[in-house]
Amino acid sequence: MHMFYYSIYDRKARSYGDLISFPSGEKEAAIRWFRDVVMDSDSKNILHRYPEDFDFCYIGYFDKDKGRFYPVDAGIVTIINAGEFFLDSEYRQEEV
């Protein structure tokens, strides 16, 4: 079984946040989680207030059977910038 790892990169701080794991290799599920975090309009949510400063990045995966971590061959991959959720209708949450 594999666990897939992502991190949020802060462009202003020039640093990565804690690792975030997902049991599914489906990138869309990870993007959905990130979108939900970014779109939370709580006034303390820095990702919502400054979305252009944050990138969601794929780091690699951990093979639980082998006990080994496999980083991305090409280095850390930026999946999406949080600002795209405010610009692209594909990622906007529908109003209920």
UniProtKB/Swiss-Prot annotation:
Plays a central role in the packaging of viral DNA into phage procapsid, which occurs in the late stage of infection. Can interact with the replicative complex after the completion of one round of DNA synthesis. When protein ORF5 is bound to the replicative form, the complex becomes accessible to procapsid and serves as a DNA packaging apparatus. It comes from the Viruses. It holds the Pfam family Phage_ORF5. This is Protein ORF5. InterPro entries: Phage_ORF5 (IPR046781). Belongs to the microviridae C protein family.
